[in-house]
């Protein structure tokens, strides 16, 4: 004669299943997030190669930064430069008047990865927009002093350009209200970079003046 499960047995089974789910779900999420970051770092590496190829064809000069204070362009500020499209290195993206290299940031749906280079800056209509600057910690990258030094001349800046993804847990709503905190050392200062300990921060690839590329992809 066959007997069904008793209530106690069912409760034990449910408890075991719940325990297994509690253990496995965070691990699955972590694995998925790690895979996503691997893809992003790989794409930033590829964009870095495209920038170097562009510079080789243009007497060592890199594409200008693009930014715009108009509402229709704010979320696309510092989008990947259209020069990489014109040179055939990256696919074309266009939203309204904003034209850029289309490789979507996996952490910022509908927007490309960001690019900031010390030197000339233009708006999305092609008009000069002054010089793009970066505030870089004194001693970077060997160490980060308390003082931030403003650079707007690529010939003296220790950083040539910075590529970045918004990374996990970035406050997207803040981008609708204000610009990135450049005056605080963003995106160069390592305190803004992704940290495995906190699980948040931007994913970066930065070219130093000596040609070396560093970034959050080096984090263990």
Which positions does each model-derived feature cover?
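Low-complexity, acidic interaction segments enriched in glycine
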Residues: 60-220
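Conserved aromatic-histidine-acidic binding/catalytic patches
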Residues: 16, 32, 36, 151
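A short linear-motif detector with a strong N-terminal bias
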Residues: 17, 25, 33, 42, ...
């Amino acid at each position: 004669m066959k007997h069904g499960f008793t209530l106690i047995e069912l409760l034990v089974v449910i408890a075991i299943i719940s325990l297994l789910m509690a253990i496995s779900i965070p691990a699955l999420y972590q694995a998925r997030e790690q895979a996503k970051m691997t893809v992003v770092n790989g794409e930033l590496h590829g964009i870095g190669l495209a920038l170097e190829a562009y510079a080789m064809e243009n007497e060592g000069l890199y594409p200008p930064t693009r930014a715009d204070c108009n509402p229709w362009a704010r979320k696309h500020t510092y989008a990947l430069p259209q020069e990489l499209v014109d040179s055939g290195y990256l696919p074309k993206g266009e939203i309204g008047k904003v034209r850029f290299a289309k490789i979507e940031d996996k952490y910022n749906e509908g927007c490309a990865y960001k690019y900031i280079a010390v030197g000339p800056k233009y708006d999305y209509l092609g008009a000069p927009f002054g010089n793009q600057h970066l505030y870089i910690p004194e001693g970077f990258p060997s160490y980060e002093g308390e003082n931030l030094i403003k650079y707007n001349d690529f010939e003296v800046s220790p950083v040539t350009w910075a590529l970045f993804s918004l990374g996990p847990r970035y406050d997207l709503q803040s981008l609708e209200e204000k610009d990135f905190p450049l005056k605080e050392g963003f995106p160069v200062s390592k305190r803004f970079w992704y940290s495995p300990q906190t699980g948040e921060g931007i994913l970066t690839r930065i070219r130093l003046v000596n040609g070396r590329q560093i970034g959050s992809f080096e984090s263990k």
